[in-house]
Amino acid sequence: MPPDGSAPADTIPRATTYVICSSMYKMIREFAHEQLVTNDKSQEIARQHATYFLTLVEETEPKLTGSAQQGWLNHLEAEHDNIRAALRWARDTGAVEIGLRLAGALWRFWESHGHFPEGRKWLDYWLTCPMGDTNGAPMWTRAKALSGAARLADRQGAYMQSEELAAESVALYRAIGDHPGIAHALNALATAVADQHDYVRAEAWFTESWSYGGNSAIAMTRQ
């Protein structure tokens, strides 16, 4: 140590470096924390966005038939980019039930506005989701998505696939005793079978569909 008690010259750079590094690490920690907080807020906003559009889609779905249907279909078309963002968020975060519910409620919109490839892509994804077991979602959610997927497959000429999807939907709806659901899925099954020219089975399925759904099932066959 020098006679005046000051620190040796060769220790000054090391001490200075230590102080600088400590300050940098502190700044990095603070920045990382701020980013985590920001990301948490962004994720929460994205979740709320997806939840909002799930509610919108599910509340709009029953209005997609009848005299006012075109206005509601156009409303969904205007929000299509937001709906796509909600579907992507559900996919990217593994929110299987939200994604399945969105897709299941959107099939009539996709069908009416000709978004067949997009609709089938999303429905196929959620029904065979690699990020989670869709069987863990409520049974009616899967049954509804299967029925919608059957409709879109039939519209694109995939009649055998449509039949398989509709048959699984019927089985699930039967298991939970959902009569309107059974009527709708049987109608989809009958349509797929009729498109394969199996009119005997088609008539049987249509007849059973009417027995479960009454006038509502008959209306579905005319849409």
What are these regions (language model features)?
Residues M1-T38, Q43, R47, D92, ...:
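C-terminal boundary/linker of central alpha/beta nucleotide-binding cores
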Residues F31, Q35, Q69-T134, T141-G148:
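Short, well-ordered secondary-structure microsegments
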Residues T38-K41, K63-N74, W107-R120, R151-E164, ...:
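Short coil/turn connectors between adjacent alpha-helices in alpha-solenoid helical repeat scaffolds
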Residues A46-G66, L87, A103-L106, W126-L127:
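Short acidic-capped amphipathic helix/loop micro-motif used as an active-site/signal-coupling element
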Residues R47, E77, T93, E97, ...:
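Residue signature of alpha-solenoid helical repeat architecture, marking inter-repeat boundaries
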Residues I83-A86, G119, L123-W126, S162, ...:
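Tetratricopeptide repeat
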Residues L87-R88, L127-G132, A167-D178, T207-I218:
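Amphipathic alpha-helical segments of tetratricopeptide repeats
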Residues L100-H113, T141-Y159, S169-A171, G181-D198, ...:
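Tandem amphipathic alpha-helical repeat scaffolds
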